[in-house]
Structures are given as C-alpha cells and as structure tokens.
Design a protein with these regions (language model features):
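Beta-strand-rich solenoid/repeat architectures in extracellular/passenger domains
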Residues: 86-91, 110-121, 139-155, 172-184
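Right-handed parallel beta-helix/beta-solenoid
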Residues: 18-48, 65, 83
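Extracellular beta-strand-rich solenoid/capping regions of secreted or surface-exposed proteins
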Residues: 47, 52-55, 67-81, 89-135, ...
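Extended, compositionally simple hydrophobic/Ser/Thr-rich segments
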Residues: 166-170
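Bacterial N-terminal signal peptides
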Residues: 8-17
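Positively charged n-region of N-terminal signal peptides that target proteins for export
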Residues: 1-4
Length: 184
C-alpha cells in the first residue's frame, strides 16, 4: 500500500510540474494563447508568452506577422528570438517597464523586425525603467511615424528612454543599449 501511494504521489508530482521550470516558450501565428507554449503547442501572442515566462526565460517566435493593438509590456528579464529578421515581424511597440526598479532587467531581442508604430506615440522600443540592459542582435526597426498632439513633434525614434513620466524631469539611470547587426 505504501509503495502504491508513493508511486501515485511521484506520478502526480511529475505530471503537475511539467511547464513550471520551462525556460523556453514558443509563439506561432497558428498557436493559441490557451496552449502551454511548448514547441508542439505554441502560444499565439508574444504578450501571452511574456506573461507566462519566468524571469530570464527565452521566447522563440516563429515566422509570421504579429500585429499588436496595444504595446507589449516587458516587465522582466527575457530573451525574444525570432526565426529570422526578414519574416518574423512585430507590428507595434515594446515597452520595457519593470516594477522593481532596484534590480537589473536584461532584455535580449534577436532576429526580429519591429515596425509600424503609426498609431502609437514614442518609439518602437521604449525604455521606461532604470537599470535596463537592452541587447539587440539582428533586429530591424523601421516605418516609424509620429503621433500627433502629444508633444512628440514631427518625428519618432526607434529606441526612446522615457522614465516613468513624460515630462522634462524624466531620467532613467543605468540604461545600456547594445546593437549587433541591427538596423535602426
């Protein structure tokens, strides 16, 4: 009896722990946000993958176009890797905004195309917290169009360091941006 209970407990622990330590999540245009995020059951949106990911996880994005209605908020250390920078396209903006500003956040973006910030203000990638290391490798930022009436003027930028407010007193300390084979 004890062996049987021990065996059932072990099976239960293994079955319920699947995905808890998952460091790689997968996103595909054919996925569903109700999926677990594994290679065989990818998620549909990058935002959902970020929500499900542990701090320091890697999100692997399949070829496709990923339109965003609102900015994708990145509140933790994460790596997002696209299949390639020509065919893996995020249409929208990324806001890097950590709640715990005393710790460092490392955001690595690779092999992605980030484009069309036409209805959004600021830039395509907005650093809104201090202590951020942003690393871009094989990332292309383009088709920037400024918003109107929000004080941002006639042009928009690829990467903007905003701080927590949008006035002249906004300062982000200790923000590092590293570019490798990237086009801004």
């Amino acid at each position: 009896m004890k062996r049987r209970l021990l065996f059932l407990f072990a099976v239960f622990m293994v079955a319920t722990s699947v995905g808890w330590g998952q460091t790689d999540l997968y996103v595909s245009t054919s996925g569903s946000d109700g999926n677990g995020g594994g290679v065989e059951a990818p998620l549909a949106t990058i935002a959902k993958a970020i929500e499900k990911a542990a701090d320091g996880a890697t999100i692997r994005v399949a070829e496709g176009i990923y339109p965003q209605v609102s900015p994708i908020v990145i509140p933790k250390s994460i790596t997002i890797i696209g299949s390639d920078s020509t065919n893996c396209i995020i249409e929208g903006q990324l806001d890097i905004q950590r709640d715990e500003e005393e710790s460092v956040i490392n955001v690595n973006l690779r092999n992605l195309q980030i484009t069309k910030a036409t209805t959004l203000s600021q830039g395509l990638i907005n650093v809104m917290s201090k202590n951020v290391n942003l690393n871009l490798s094989g990332v292309h930022l383009h088709q920037l169009t400024a918003g109107s009436g929000d004080g941002w003027g006639k042009s928009s930028m690829g990467i903007v360091n905003l701080g927590k407010s949008y006035d002249s007193n906004s300062i982000c300390d200790n923000v590092n941006v590293s570019l490798t084979n990237s086009c801004i």
